[in-house]
C-alpha cells in the first residue's frame, strides 16, 4: 500500500472521519506534503511511524526545508487530522467526567499520546535509573528527549522579528498554533478548560514528560507566577478534581524558581516521587490547628508536611506558615528574609490526596546570594555544578534529577577513564574522575565502572539537594528549623 493511502486509512480508523472522507483526507495530506509522495510505498503499520515517514519523504523531495522546525510544523499538522476540535475534546472530557473522572482523564491522556502531542518516541530515549541514598531511593534521568536546534536554526531565530503571539508557551493561544522557528508547533495541541477558585484554567499534558502522566495546569490569563494563599487553595482543588494526580508549584522567585516565571501554572501527574515516601522524622501540632497532623520529613531539603481531612484548615495553616517564612530571619544559620526590600523567602508547595486525606508538603526556599556563592547560597554549589548547575525546581525538589544531555557521553568517558582507556575527560569532570579513580584504582570491567560513575552521579544529586536545603542536616540546622516552627506556634507537650 502507498504511504499516503496507509496514513489516510489510519486517520479514518483513529478519528471520527469515515470512508467517504478518504478523497478529502488524501487531498488534505497532499496539500501539506506535495504530490511527489503519491507513489511512495511503505511497510510501516503505526500511525506515528507513518507520519514520520511522510515528513522525511517531504524533506527528501524538498517540499519543505530540511530543518527541525519545518519537520515539527508538518508533523503536528498531519496529526491534527486525528485530533478532534477543542470544543469536541472538551465536550467528550466533561461528558465522561460526569460518570467517571478517572475515565475522562485516561481518555484525554490516550488522545494526547495517539496524536503525538506527548512525544513517546523521544521520551523513550531518556536514560533513567534509581540510586539508594540516606533519604530513600532517588530517581536520576538524563534528558535526551528534546530535539536540539541546529546552529543554522538558532541563527535564523535571532533574525526573526519578535512576536508577542502567543505571549508564552503556556498561553491558551498555543492551541492549534502553526509554529515558527522560535516557537513550537502546536496544531495538534488541545487544552481542557475548567473553573478553579472562580477563574478559568487549562489542563494539558507535557509533550516531553519527565514522569508518568506529567501534566500542566495553567492560568487562562497570562499572569506571573505567584505563591499565595490562592496557590494552596488551587493545589488542593486540583488533587480533588483530578483523582490520582499530585499537584505542585514551582517557587516564584529567581534562583529557586522554575524556568517559566511569567505565566502562573502548576505541574502534576500520576507518579510517586521519592519525597512522597519520606517518613516524618519529627511530629508536632500547630496551635489553633489541632486537627492537622504536622511534621518535618526526612529529606535533604527543608520540608513541613501537613495532613488533614479539612482543606480549609490546611489552607489556613499553610498560609500562616508561608507568611511567617516570608518575614523570618535567623542570622545564626544565614537565613535572611530580605535585603533592602528585595524578598528572599518563598515556598515550593506540593499537594496530594493520600488515604482519603489531603496532604501539603511545604518546601522552604531562600534565594540569597553571597560572594562565596554568587549563584545562590541555597543552590548547587560550585563543586557539584559539573553535574547540575540549573535551578532546583519542583521536580528535582521531589527527588527526580533532570540532568542535561551532555552527561550521557561524559559519564561514559569518565567510566572509560576509570578502566585506564586513553580518553579525554571534560575539564570540569577531571577532579571528580581522579577522585573516583583513587577510590577504585584497579578497575578493569567497563560495566562495573559505568555503574560506579552512575551511582556517584546519584550521590552528587543528594549533595545538590542538600545545598538547596535552607536548614542543613546537622544538629545546628535541625535545631534552627525547630526555632522557625516554634515561631509559627506549636503546642508544647
Swiss-Prot record:
PROSITE patterns, per database record: GAL_P_UDP_TRANSF_II
This enzyme's EC code(s): 2.7.7.12
The organism's place on the tree of life at top rank: Bacteria
Subcellular location: Cytoplasm
One CC-aspect GO term: cytoplasm
Top-level EC class: transferase
Pathway stated in the Swiss-Prot or TrEMBL entry: Carbohydrate metabolism; galactose metabolism
Gene Ontology biological-process annotations: galactose metabolic process
Listed InterPro entries: GalP_uridyl_Trfase_II (IPR000766), GalP_uridyl_Trfase_II_CS (IPR023425), GalP_Utransf_C (IPR005850), GalP_Utransf_N (IPR005849)
Signal peptide: none
Pfam families according to UniProt: GalP_UDP_tr_C (PF02744), GalP_UDP_transf (PF01087)
Family from the record: Belongs to the galactose-1-phosphate uridylyltransferase type 2 family.
Protein name: Galactose-1-phosphate uridylyltransferase 2
Source organism of the structure: Streptococcus pneumoniae (strain ATCC BAA-255 / R6)
Lineage of the species this protein comes from: Bacteria, Bacillati, Bacillota, Bacilli, Lactobacillales
